[in-house]
Amino acid sequence: MSILGVIPGIHVAAPRDAGTLAEELREAVAISDAPSVIRYPKASVGADLPALERVGSVDVLRRSGTDVLLVTVGALGELGLEAAQRLEDQGIGVTVVDPRWIYPMSVDLVEMAASHRLVVTVEDGGRHGGFGSALAAACATPTSRSRCATSRCRNGSTTTASVERCWRCAASPRRTWRAA
């Protein structure tokens, strides 16, 4: 997915489930002034994950505080919710969001990030140049108090991994919290 970010004006959707795939497909077809791409998993998707609310262009999947903002990309939404539960069990307030559209970067997401101590992206792309890197760059302002971290499957050449492998590779709640 990181290579798509260099295409000027591109719109890239990463649906989290079948429901958002249908919705984002309709939105992609309506884009007439730029290229659009929908990135979906090759495996079957899990159950639909309903949003609590939509803030601008961002779906909020869970909200219990502003210590950590977990930004889940695509089908990793359920894993983000599981990680949030683990953090909440340790007394850490978490907001889990799905940006829906990876590119262009959502101003709404950048504003959400500014109100959290730590921002963690959960994605299955490469270490460099992915969505997490783009979000960290967008959030890097002189007045920002948020720290950004990424959780990815692997660093190196483009390969594929199962969702279970991505979860095993993700940072533990303890290591994530220490990063703050």
Model-predicted regions and their roles:
Residues 30-180:
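Thiamine diphosphate
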Residues 1-28:
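Conserved thiamine diphosphate
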